[in-house]
């Protein structure tokens, strides 16, 4: 394979990866944890947070705070895994 063919293939792979990155960015990731529901976009922006009224205890606000934090962190981890898989897919492709 000559250098021009390698450059063309690299550009094609880069374009494909950019398309897939945009698809992940638009995707919604949903995590449900014990009465908490977090919907996060692939851009890592929170779309919605739903909290079950049964969880709201004025005597223990830390419970809800902890559950929200856990759900958000899990959503971020799931998104990061998708991006890592995408990166692995293209880094293992020979040019």
Swiss-Prot record:
InterPro entries: YbaB-like_sf, YbaB/EbfC
Subcellular location: Cytoplasm, Nucleoid
Annotated function: Binds to DNA and alters its conformation. May be involved in regulation of gene expression, nucleoid organization and DNA protection.
GO molecular function, one term: DNA binding
Keywords, sorted A to Z: Cytoplasm, DNA-binding
Pfam families: YbaB_DNA_bd
Gene3D superfamilies found in the cross-reference section: Nucleoid-associated protein YbaB-like domain (3.30.1310.10)
Top-level taxon of origin: Bacteria
HAMAP family (alphabetical): DNA_YbaB_EbfC
Family affiliation: Belongs to the YbaB/EbfC family.
The name this protein goes by in its record: Nucleoid-associated protein MARTH_orf159
Main location: cytoplasm
Cellular compartments per GO CC: bacterial nucleoid; cytoplasm
Subunit annotation: Homodimer.
NCBIfam families: DNA_YbaB_EbfC (TIGR00103)
């Amino acid at each position: 394979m000559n250098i021009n063919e390698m450059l063309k293939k690299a550009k094609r792979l880069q374009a494909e990866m950019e398309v897939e990155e945009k698809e992940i960015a638009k995707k919604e990731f949903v995590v449900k944890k014990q009465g908490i529901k977090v919907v996060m976009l692939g851009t890592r922006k929170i779309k919605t947070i739903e909290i079950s009224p049964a969880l709201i205890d004025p005597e223990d606000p830390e419970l809800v705070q902890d559950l929200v934090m856990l759900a958000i962190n899990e959503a971020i981890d799931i998104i990061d895994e998708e991006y890592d898989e995408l990166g692995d897919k293209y880094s293992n492709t020979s040019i």
